[in-house]
Amino acid sequence: MSRFDTLFANLKAKNEGAFVPFVTLCDPDFDRSFEIIETLIANGADALELGFPFSDPLLDGSVIQAANKRALDGGYSTDACFEMIAKIRSKYPEIPIGLLLCANLVFVPTQCVFFNRCAESGVDAVLIADVPVLASEEFTQAAKKHGIQSVFICPPNADQVTIERIANLTEGYTYLVSRSGVTSAENQAHAKNLDNLIESLKRSNSAPILQGFGIAKPAQVKEALALGCDGAISGSAIVKIIERNLDSQTQLLSELAKFVSVMKAATKS
């Protein structure tokens, strides 16, 4: 089984959900970013969703856009990101690692080169935010060739045909978007039809469902699990902690540890 498959099987046996934090790699720099990831894992992160710095992140709101800019301003590239992933994998051989990024970062080195680097560094799954399921065949084939699981977003307006395509192609986990728009910890609303979407995904035998966008409080994690999700992803809330503590790594790591601990605790019944 893959690391994600093993994780969800183990959590199901314990009647727990998954808490998955998102951060942009190399924000605010390489060494501090690695310490941030160590803190996430030490305080209960079940898996990691990692972004590569990019100049035009399509799904991201202002908070994660700023994280991308900090990393880019520091001169950090895709090479540095793969170097960090290899370092994470060396220290944490069991933690599932997923990437969330834009197609440009996959196309530029060629898909074969990109997914080969993913495999070599220890990536488990890749979600390409701006590639819809209908246009995904060449990506999924390249990923599969290198043993990388393909993850797709299920939007809140997905019809049954789209849901079935997502369920058929997605491996590792299904990213259920809480609402339309971009990432934000402030906008914590979610679409009214999420329960129906979750039921439809499960009827279509989808990969385990993680709800993302606007997840910033333990109550929202509990709500996602109550709706039938297998866990929740939190990104903007975590990146905001980084942003407001750029002058104190000690305070940053302390605040981050507390946040992750309470969010993970919310996954336990």
UniProtKB/Swiss-Prot annotation:
Pathway: Amino-acid biosynthesis; L-tryptophan biosynthesis; L-tryptophan from chorismate: step 5/5. One of its GO terms (cellular component) is cytosol. The keyword ATP-binding does not apply. Pfam families: Trp_syntA. It catalyses: (1S,2R)-1-C-(indol-3-yl)glycerol 3-phosphate + L-serine = D-glyceraldehyde 3-phosphate + L-tryptophan + H2O. The active site is at residues 49, 60. Keywords: Amino-acid biosynthesis, Aromatic amino acid biosynthesis, Lyase, Tryptophan biosynthesis. It is an enzyme of class 4 (lyase). GO terms for molecular function: tryptophan synthase activity. Its EC number is 4.2.1.20. It comes from the Bacteria. Belongs to the TrpA family. The alpha subunit is responsible for the aldol cleavage of indoleglycerol phosphate to indole and glyceraldehyde 3-phosphate. Tetramer of two alpha and two beta chains. This is Tryptophan synthase alpha chain. It comes from Actinobacillus pleuropneumoniae serotype 7 (strain AP76). The gene is trpA.
